[in-house]
UniProtKB/Swiss-Prot annotation:
Family: Belongs to the ketol-acid reductoisomerase family.
Note from the entry: Present with 883000 molecules/cell in log phase SD medium.
Record field: catalytic activity: (2R)-2,3-dihydroxy-3-methylbutanoate + NADP(+) = (2S)-2-acetolactate + NADPH + H(+); (2R,3R)-2,3-dihydroxy-3-methylpentanoate + NADP(+) = (S)-2-ethyl-2-hydroxy-3-oxobutanoate + NADPH + H(+)
Cross-referenced Gene3D superfamilies: N-(1-d-carboxylethyl)-l-norvaline Dehydrogenase, domain 2, NAD(P)-binding Rossmann-like Domain
Catalytic EC class: oxidoreductase
GO BP, sorted A to Z: branched-chain amino acid biosynthetic process; isoleucine biosynthetic process; L-valine biosynthetic process; mitochondrial genome maintenance
Annotated NADP(+) binding sites: 84-93, 108-113, 146-150
Pathways per UniProt: Amino-acid biosynthesis; L-isoleucine biosynthesis; L-isoleucine from 2-oxobutanoate: step 2/4; Amino-acid biosynthesis; L-valine biosynthesis; L-valine from pyruvate: step 2/4
InterPro entries: 6-PGluconate_DH-like_C_sf (IPR008927), 6PGD_dom2 (IPR013328), KARI (IPR013023), KARI_C (IPR000506), KARI_N (IPR013116), KetolA_reductoisomerase_fun (IPR016207), NAD(P)-bd_dom_sf (IPR036291)
Natural source organism: Saccharomyces cerevisiae (strain ATCC 204508 / S288c)
Chief localization: mitochondrion
UniProt-annotated binding residues for Mg(2+) 1: D255, E259
Record function comment: Involved in the biosynthesis of branched-chain amino acids (BCAA). Catalyzes the second common step in the parallel biosynthesis of isoleucine and valine. Converts alpha-aceto-alpha-hydroxybutyrate (AHB) to alpha,beta-dihydroxy-beta-methylvalerate (DHMV) and alpha-acetolactate (AL) to alpha,beta-dihydroxy-isovalerate (DHV) in isoleucine and valine biosynthesis, respectively.
Entry protein name: Ketol-acid reductoisomerase, mitochondrial
Amino acid sequence: MLRTQAARLICNSRVITAKRTFALATRAAAYSRPAARFVKPMITTRGLKQINFGGTVETVYERADWPREKLLDYFKNDTFALIGYGSQGYGQGLNLRDNGLNVIIGVRKDGASWKAAIEDGWVPGKNLFTVEDAIKRGSYVMNLLSDAAQSETWPAIKPLLTKGKTLYFSHGFSPVFKDLTHVEPPKDLDVILVAPKGSGRTVRSLFKEGRGINSSYAVWNDVTGKAHEKAQALAVAIGSGYVYQTTFEREVNSDLYGERGCLMGGIHGMFLAQYDVLRENGHSPSEAFNETVEEATQSLYPLIGKYGMDYMYDACSTTARRGALDWYPIFKNALKPVFQDLYESTKNGTETKRSLEFNSQPDYREKLEKELDTIRNMEIWKVGKEVRKLRPENQ
């Protein structure tokens, strides 16, 4: 009888495996098919494209709406004064330059950012200036300083924003929380925002690969009646693949919320909790790290990024699928109150106040280094360094 049951299980397993293999092959073909069959016609059609995102129709803009020749003509009389050369300044500045637009950098002379800009080919007196000189020369002033630095430098920058210029942000932080930052944009200028959904390094690397990062855009002031098209065009010019409309308020709330949640803080907390429980139950550091971080980042997350979470439920084993289906509602119900508190904390300005207070302290770098050193010395991340060394490509 046991042999008969075992034979049935094996047979059923083979049938399920065969069906799942066929389903995955069909699914994979479905995911890859649009790239070959539908993208090109969409690129060659109208500028406005409406996409149904899970039942909500939104208008998106793509590179096809602003090809390079159109960008060069639209911005032919403009100079982009990019203030700050940190993560976003680096990525957006180099992409603008590679797209053939007239961009200059404004930073503190002889400071670290000045030296970094020179290493990237920016030339003092030609396209590298002090902040004041750059703003005076620019028709677009792209304020890409850190949030704390924007607040500190605003009294010096605001008088330089003369009529006719366009003020640009990549984060809604400063103008939205103006009661805390004291950054109140002039009412007689177009004020726009383009917020890449990733770091400046990613903005640059995806552009160099011929791809593009997703970005949102928003308009604070539309004095000329052209603020929307300015933002859409500039979003493409800095290297966006597609861009969608939001507001300054929604951008800053979703950005702060995401960074503290699934993008950084929340995922780090989940990694630590799972790792700790495994270690407390006798699992080795290597096993705990592999089951918590390595498998997630090297195997599962790339597939989720490429095909979606629904694909993963088809792609995993029957045992993994059953467990995930049973447990994801439990995690959702446990975590949702935390996320609700987090969103309220971003919306009411608590996170902004905390950020400004900490990042404006004269010894904030020393305090930050202590916090980062604590993370570096956590067992989980020490183990991670050793595990990464064992990857074949690192040997």
